[in-house]
Structure formats: structure tokens, C-alpha cells
């Protein structure tokens, strides 16, 4: 877990606890190519070291494939999906509009796409304000399933509904995904939670901290200082007496400010 991940975790934890809610932990481990052995155990250890104790059992998406398949089948029965082998390279960044390209890689695993419309999806983000997107024109028919794996968009929509998520707090890099998720929620007759997208932590090169950019993982040796920096980034600078306090004390102070 890098510093940007910690900021997102702290932001969502404080928001949930300020409202007297539960903070649920979901491990998004369905992308087998990107899953690193031992990473989940390390994340759980880091969260506990920083006083970020979750409520209930940890949810592993890799154990919920049947729930995602059922949602996909429901959309298929409504005639809202189609099979496609177009690659990202073939699309060259253009929205997919049910017109597959001629340069199809027939060796690639088939993807299932959702048919989109020209409907504009609008919502009010607690931090970013009003957001509107025409999914059909700006994104196109997006992937729900590829090969043996569900897409991120489908999985999180199913999980948010299944576990009664009332508020989603996450990084602003996922703001653009939210209209797609609301679109799926409406097609599946699922409730739409409230959303709050946090500012991103950027590296010295101006890029978002991420595993792909080789962001350094946080340690637990200087966790009091690291927690203070995370809270400061979120606008909750602890007072001087708490500057070197244990993370759980700093979190309790931040929660009480609400």
C-alpha cells in the first residue's frame, strides 16, 4: 500500500465513522494478472498498524464470481449485451458503438459489452460537485466481462448493492467511472450510493502515485508521522499535541471534528 492508497483509506474511514457508519473492506482481486502473491496480507497488516480497523469480514471479489455472472446473465436476457473481440489498440481510444472493427484478433478472448445510449448520467459528488457524462458518446459500449473475468465496473456495482453500501469514498481517478456504474445500477434496478471523490496524491513528476508508477510502499515504522501527513493532505491537520500521537488517536480526533 502506497501513500496515495493510505490517503484514500483514511478519507473513507473518517467519512464513514463521522456518520456513525461501518467501514467495509473489499479486496478487488479478480484481475489475476495484476494480483501479487502476499500483497493482500501486507495490506491488511498495514491497515491494522494505522488504526484502520474494518467492520465485518473482508470481502474478496475472487470469491464472488457467481454473483457477477448472475448480473451479467440478467443483462444478457434483456438483450443489452453483445460479444466483441475488438482490442484497445484497434479502437485507438474511440468509443465503441456496437460496430466492431475489421481488424479483429480472433485469438483474443471474447469480451461482453453493454449497449449504451445517448442518455446523460448526472450526479452530485460530495467533493467534486455536479458531474454529467453521456456514456454512449463519451465512453461507448464498455466491457462487462472478458475471458473468465468480470470487469471492475460490473463487479463493484454488484458488490456495492449486495453489501448495502450507502456511500463510496475513493480517489478522483475513478470519478470518470461513476457514470458507467450508475448506468449499470439503473439497468439492474439497484440503488445508487452517494459518492465522494478525493483529490489524488501526485508524485514529483505530476503523475498519480500507483503501483504502475512504482510508488514506494508505506512502512509502519514511522506510522504516526505518515498518518499525520495523510490527515494533513485531507485537510484534517492534527493539533501540535497530537502530531506524534498513535494513528488511532489521530483518527479519533479527525472523526470528532465532524
Predicted segments — roles?
Residues 1-95, 172-190, 242-243:
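N-terminal Rossmann-like or analogous alpha/beta NTP/dinucleotide-binding catalytic cores
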Residues 3, 70, 150-151, 197, ...:
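Hydrophobic alpha-helical context, especially transmembrane and signal-peptide helices
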Residues 18-21, 119, 207-258:
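Non-catalytic terminal extensions that flank enzyme cores
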Residues 58-65, 190-193, 204-207, 229-237:
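Low-complexity, flexible helical/coil segments
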Residues 62-78, 99-110, 237-255:
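Short secondary-structure transition/capping segments
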Residues 83, 88-220, 238:
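Active-site cores that bind ATP or allylic diphosphates and position pyrophosphate for catalysis
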Amino acid at each position: 500500500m502506497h501513500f496515495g492508497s493510505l490517503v484514500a483509506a483514511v478519507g473513507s474511514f473518517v467519512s464513514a465513522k463521522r456518520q456513525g457508519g461501518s467501514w467495509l473492506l473489499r479486496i478487488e482481486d479478480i484481475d489475476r494478472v495484476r494480483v501479487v502473491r502476499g500483497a493482500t496480507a501486507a495490506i491488511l497488516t498495514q491497515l491494522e498498524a494505522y488504526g484502520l480497523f474494518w467492520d465485518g469480514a473482508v470481502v474478496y471479489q475472487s470469491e464472488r464470481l457467481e454473483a457477477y455472472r448472475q448480473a451479467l446473465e440478467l443483462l444478457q436476457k434483456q438483450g443489452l449485451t453483445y460479444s466483441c473481440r475488438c482490442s484497445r489498440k484497434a479502437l485507438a481510444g474511440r468509443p465503441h458503438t456496437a460496430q466492431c472493427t475489421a481488424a479483429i484478433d480472433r485469438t483474443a478472448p471474447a469480451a461482453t459489452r453493454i449497449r449504451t445510449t445517448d442518455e446523460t448520467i448526472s450526479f452530485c459528488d460530495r467533493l467534486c460537485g455536479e458531474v454529467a457524462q453521456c456514456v454512449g458518446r463519451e465512453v461507448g459500449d464498455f466491457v462487462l466481462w472478458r475471458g473468465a473475468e468480470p470487469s471492475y465496473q460490473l463487479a463493484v456495482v454488484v458488490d456495492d448493492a449486495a453489501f448495502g453500501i450507502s456511500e463510496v469514498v475513493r480517489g478522483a481517478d475513478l470519478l470518470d467511472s461513476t457514470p458507467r456504474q450508475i448506468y449499470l445500477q439503473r439497468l439492474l434496478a439497484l440503488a445508487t450510493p452517494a459518492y465522494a471523490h478525493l483529490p489524488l496524491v501526485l508524485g514529483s513528476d505530476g503523475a498519480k502515485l500507483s503501483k504502475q508508477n512504482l510508488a514506494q510502499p508505506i512502512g509502519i515504522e514511522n506510522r504516526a508521522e505518515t498518518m499525520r501527513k495523510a490527515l494533513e493532505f485531507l485537510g484534517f491537520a492534527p493539533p501540535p499535541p497530537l502530531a506524534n500521537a498513535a494513528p488511532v488517536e489521530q483518527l479519533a480526533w479527525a472523526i470528532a471534528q465532524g
